[in-house]
Amino acid sequence: MRAIIYLLLISAMVFSMTKAVPEEEGLQLSEDERGGCLPHNRFCNALSGPRCCSGLKCKELSIYDSRCLG
């Protein structure tokens, strides 16, 4: 009986997570993201990886967090 309840709970959680972001919204990319640059407040890596869009710089906020900021 417990196994059935757990299975139902897990199924409900997975279903709610997939419905949290509409499919069209999840698949849309902005012009800047398609071009390879990162928009404002996105995670970045100052040493490698995609660069921030024009006017933004990759700023290190902590040892584990760098973001594109103006």
Swiss-Prot record:
GO terms for cellular component: extracellular region. Residues 1-20 form the signal peptide. The modification Leucine amide is found at residue 69. Disulfide bonds join 37-53, 44-58, 52-68. It comes from the Eukaryota. Keywords: Amidation, Disulfide bond, Knottin, Neurotoxin, Secreted, Signal, Toxin. GO terms for molecular function: toxin activity. The keyword Disulfide bond applies. It is found in: Secreted. Residues 21-34 form a propeptide. Expressed by the venom gland. The presence of a 'disulfide through disulfide knot' structurally defines this protein as a knottin. Belongs to the neurotoxin 01 (U2-agtx) family. Insect active toxin causing rapid but reversible paralysis in crickets. No activity shown in mammals. Does not show effect on mammalian voltage-gated calcium channels. This is U2-agatoxin-Ao1d. It comes from Agelena orientalis (Funnel-web spider).
